Amino acid sequence: MIMQLQEQRYYSPEEYLELEVNSEIRHEYIDGQIIPMTGGTPNHNQLALNLSGTLNFLLKRQPYRVFITDQRLWIPKRRIYTYPDVMVVQTPLEYQEGRKDTLVNPVMIAEVLSKSTKSYDRDEKFAAYRTISSFCEYILIDQYTMHVEHYCKTDNNKWIFSEYDDGDVTLNLAAVPCQVLLADIYDQVDFSVEE
C-alpha cells in the first residue's frame, strides 16, 4: 500500500482504533501517528491476490489462515497497527487483548513493493515485524519487474536472504508447508503499466 503522512498530532492506540472503526479508508498507526493508506495499483492488487489465492488453495484443511490487505495486525513492541498485503497465521488465531478484529500471531507476511514504500517495507517495517515471536518468513514482491526477496528465520534466530527473478523458480516456503511458482505470483501482471 502507498502511505501518506498526516499532520503531526499524536494519538493513543484507543483513539486510533475508535477513528479506524468509523473511517472509510484504512490507516496505519505508528507509535502515536496515524498514516492514511491509499489504494494500490492494479499490479499491486493482482500480486497480493495471486499470492494469497495460491496460499489459500495450498493450505486448505491445514492449520493456517491466509489474510489479505484488510486484516489489521498489532505489533506491541513497536506500538504499530498495520495491514500487511498478505499474512498467514497458524491457528488458533491470537487476537490483541480485548479485540476480535486485530491479530498478533502471523508466521508469514508478504508486502508488494511500491516506489513510495519499498524502503520502509525493507527496513523499518521488517524490523518491526521481527519483534513478533511467531513471525518467521517475509516476502517482498516487486510490482515493476519479476523480482522477489525472501527472508526466512532460522532456529537460532538468524535471517537467511534469497532473491528470485525467474518465473520458472519455485519459492519454497519455510513457515508453511507449500511451494509457490514465481510465475503464479506474477500471473496477469502487466509491467508496461506505470504507477
Predicted features by range, described:
Residues 1-195:
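Gly/Pro/Ser/Thr-rich low-complexity, intrinsically disordered segments predominantly at protein N-termini
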